[in-house]
Amino acid sequence: MVATVFAFVICFSSFIKVKKATVAAYQITSISTERNATGQQQQWTWALTNPNPGNGDNGTLQDVSHWSLALSPLAEASLVSAEYSFDQITWVSVSIQMDRDPTIKTCTTDDVLKFDVGTRGGESTYYRVTFDREFTTNTFATSYIKTGGGRNGCNLYYFAGVGGTTND
């Protein structure tokens, strides 16, 4: 019996092609979580990076067109500002309107904070949000990444983001 199984494996192993596993995923890195100088606000900063830019073929990733964050109702109510930057020096303010994003309607019906700017090649884009209260880190905070051209659809990404409050 063992000889039969061995012969079968040897015979058909020539038909099996082993493909090296590759994982292409955008990287969301927590840069900082800090209180401002007066201690009245907490600021969160993340970097979103495309580690393998391309057209979406052969393990490459298309540029991100926008990044949408889901926030708890308390975080939504405490949101003071949202900004993005390509260099962490010049920051551009964005609307803090929480709303449904029609471009990811097949992924979620939740209201999200939409940063309508994404990545450019392999360079990081930085995102910053400010709250008027302090929050803990949720290592499984939810976000949605939409790619340019929509080829890879909308992608659910978990990241180290805004969690529960620390001062209730």
Predicted region positions:
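Extracellular or exported targeting regions of proteins
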Residues: 16-168
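Sec-dependent, cleavable N-terminal signal peptides
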Residues: 1-21
